[in-house]
Amino acid sequence: MDPKQSRALLPLLFTGVLMGALDLAIVGPALPAIQADFGITTRQLSVLFNAYVLCQMIGTPLLAKFSDRTGPRLAYIVSIGLFAAGSLMLVIARGPELLYYGRAVQGFGAGGIFPIAAAVIGNTLPPQERGPALGILGTVFGLAFFIGPVMGGLLLPYGWRWLFLVNLPIAAVLIAGAIRLLPARSEAPSAS
């Protein structure tokens, strides 16, 4: 991979990881507003949060295996697409059921983003660039848990649906970038 393409690829991967991890933490400040809007119990609210986490854990090995079979481009697009579809379900939800399904779909899609990004870095960058890039990837993931509640608090005055609506244009840009930048098939790691 030429350096120019690598400079464009890494922000694409980092942004995807940030978006997926952010939505785990961004929902915290919105939980009371969601609870009030739908009249759901605290137990139902925990289901809303846990659906994301559980489906993310399920999605991680399945979407990573899908990436191994189909290549990172399609798997990343599917992961981001599922995440966006779940976000859209949350935006249009008029009842708690669609909220649960939306969080589950969103979490499942998010499950593929990090492992695919890590695999692309491992398979496309030269060895001397892999460690720093993977370190930044991990930092971005961790940073999301600091940024998430802050962003949630900033967007909440506009309505809790904005926490999920903001994902849609970002996902569209990520999908367009993946089509252009991600390899269709996994490349063998370079030994140079």
Language-model segments: which ranges?
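Membrane-interface "helix-start" segments
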Residues: 189-192
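Transmembrane-helix bundle of Major Facilitator Superfamily
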Residues: 1-181, 186-187
